[in-house]
Amino acid sequence: MEAIRVGFVGNPNCGKTTLFNAYTGANLKVANWPGVTVERVEGETAYKGQPLKLIDLPGIYSLTSYSIEEKVSRKCIMNNEVDVIINVVDASALERNLYLTMQLLELGKPVILALNMMDIVEERGMEIDLHRLPEMLGGIPVVPVSARKRTGLDVLMHAVVHHYEEKHKPDVVRYQEYLEEKIAVLAQKIEETYGIKENQRWYAIKLLARDEEVQKEYPIEDSNILDRLSLIHIS
């Protein structure tokens, strides 16, 4: 049976690696990502007979390619090196962590939100609406876990396998109408110019955000298009 490739993505200090290690134990393969000195850590596990290949991606705050870690993580995801993304967030600082979540949703890849540190949330008397949150995030599964106390681990892996089998992708993140018009125009131009058949929308959003890596890889030199986009900027 083919292994499901699962990427663990999250901010630094969100407990991502602790959660990763809870599944893999000492069964790890450590190397460097090609061309850089950032560690690539992989492990293996299984859930009800389904093998899983787990990849602990570097801790990042966004998918904007400013740091080596961000470039490595983004390249791994965009090159389809993972089948399912587990976005690990610190549930006690949810709003801050969801910036990366929204960027992951823009990719249109299968994403599961792992609300880590739920034990801290409960200790502080905080509440998270576990019914409303998935609706706000495009219908993705939201799973409360505690890597420290090892709770919710089976539920999370069940969600991974089910999500993979159902080929579920999040609903598209929608912006204001005038931005959507610009994104559509640019996405069409990217497809026509470079023959890209997937992720055109994401590349369009990144071009509007002045992402340097995407600007270098997919420059748009059509003056008519540029004039129509000149007043638009997504941060």
Predicted regions and their residues:
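Conserved small/polar residues in nucleotide/adenosyl-binding loops
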Residues: I232-I234
